[in-house]
UniProtKB/Swiss-Prot annotation:
Protein name: C-methyltransferase NovU
The UniProt record lists the keyword S-adenosyl-L-methionine: yes
Keyword Cytoplasm: no
Gene3D superfamilies: 6.10.250.3100, Methyltransferase, zinc-binding domain (6.20.50.110), NAD(P)-binding Rossmann-like Domain (3.40.50.720), Vaccinia Virus protein VP39 (3.40.50.150)
PANTHER family in the cross-refs: BLL5978 PROTEIN, TRANS-ACONITATE 2-METHYLTRANSFERASE-RELATED
Gene Ontology terms: biological process: methylation; novobiocin biosynthetic process
């Protein structure tokens, strides 16, 4: 166990070791480690899930780190093909083309590139593209679709290899993966080795302010090492000679920020949005201990409310299933103490997940076609970040008397007569 999990000694952003304890979820299985029928129910390994925040730079982080090979060697998260996500990815392509004038032949590199879906959109706009992803199965899918992808973590060595083979990159970026990387300094070493002097680097990360404000405790799981504010990212990037020049909000994954940085010597205008967001973070109390204590109190209350609502529905003789089987859904079920006794199944469109079993809760994952033959009275909307899109697509379920339980920011029941 000591070989694969260890407590962190210092903040991965600023190097200090002055921690404020925020919340503990005890020891839980890996939320993304889906099981097969052959897996022994008693054989799941439990890992501590404790959250702390650095009092120096206000990075929120897990207190323990699990070896990435254990977490991501055969990763089953496939980038969503939901319409809202595709639209968002297209907007990012357009923004980058406009922001730095990407032209045919320029090099774009994405780390944590998953199946290459976003790079494919960049390629359609003209640039050359290369992906980097440590999940060998997903890198294989990307290569099969014609998006060159290196099956590795993004490091200085990998950055140098790409630069040698393809030249320097005008754009290097990572979407919704930066929080998954324990050694973020090594990633930034890779950026420094690869980024052209006039290039841009960006990361898209779930936004800590939204997590705290909207009780998004289910986004806290072992695969997410870090929870970033703009302030903590500014501190991190400055230590690598990068200056934050722009920031955008994105209504994806519960609320995210897209943070652009450039070499400090580059002639990139710093947009007013940077100072505006930093000021807003101060006003939201991101650097005040009370903010994190209040989040912990709300988390405890909302977990109990979700548990009591679901168990009350089941006690009334109604059936409940999960809608979606995202990693955060597994984390929510574990945090609320819900399992197969309350939740009959989870319906998910991801083929790689179908036929598997959620860790800890032991809830089977079915395809939508299989679920259609066992329509529950209630769906617990585990993929709540797509709630408007899902509810709009499931009008027939609601019109036939079905109900959705939307758990975050606090549980509420949606019927044909009610709205979000």
């Amino acid at each position: 166990m000591q070989d694969i999990v260890r407590p962190i000694d210092e903040c991965r952003v600023c190097g200090h070791d002055d921690w404020l304890d925020v919340v503990s979820f005890g020891s839980t299985p890996l939320a993304g480690n889906l099981l097969g029928d052959e897996d022994d129910a008693g054989g799941e390994t439990l890992f501590p899930l404790d959250v702390v925040v650095c009092r120096r730079c206000w990075l929120m982080t897990l207190r323990h780190v699990i070896e990435p090979d254990v977490l991501f060697g055969h990763y089953r998260y496939v980038a969503s093909d939901a319409g809202s996500i595709i639209q968002h990815m297209r907007k990012l392509v357009d923004l980058c083309v406009e922001r730095i004038g990407l032209t045919d032949g320029d090099l774009v590199v994405e780390f944590g590139s998953n199946t290459g879906a976003h790079l494919e959109l960049f390629r359609q706009a003209g640039p050359r593209v290369v992906g980097v992803d440590p999940a060998r199965n997903l890198a294989g899918v990307a290569n099969d679709r014609g998006v060159e992808t290196i099956p590795a973590g993004f490091t200085a060595e990998v950055g140098e290899e790409i630069a040698t083979r393809h030249g320097l990159a005008r754009l290097v970026y990572g979407r919704q993966c930066f929080a998954h990387i324990p050694d973020i300094h090594e990633v930034l070493n890779g950026v420094s080795a690869l980024l052209a002097p006039d290039g841009l680097f960006f990361v898209e990360v779930p936004y800590l302010v939204e997590l705290l404000k909207n009780n998004q405790f289910d986004t806290i799981f072992h695969e997410h090492f870090s929870y970033f504010s703009l302030g903590s990212l500014c501190t991190l990037f400055e230590s690598h000679g990068l200056r934050v020049v722009d920031v955008h909000t994105a209504d994806v994954h519960g609320g995210s920020i897209v943070v652009f940085a450039a070499p400090a010597a580059a002639d990139h205008e710093v947009r007013p949005a940077v100072a505006e967001m930093l000021a807003e973070e101060r006003s939201q109390g991101i650097a005040e201990e009370r903010t994190y204590r209040e989040f912990a109190d709300r988390t405890e209350r909302v977990r109990a409310q979700i548990r009591e609502l679901v168990r009350g529905v089941v006690a009334d003789g109604k059936t409940v299933a999960g809608y979606g089987a995202p990693t955060k859904g597994s984390a929510l079920l574990a945090a609320c103490g819900l399992g197969h006794q309350e939740i009959r199944f989870c319906s998910d469109t991801t083929v790689l997940k179908q036929g598997k079993i959620l860790p800890g809760s032991r809830i089977p994952i079915w395809s939508p076609e299989q679920a259609a033959g066992h329509v529950p009275d209630y769906y617990l909307l585990l993929a709540w970040n797509y709630a408007p899109e899902i509810i709009d697509n499931e009008k027939e379920f609601l019109e036939n008397g079905g109900r959705f339980i939307v758990p975050i920011p606090e549980p509420r029941v949606i019927s044909a007569e009610s709205t979000l």
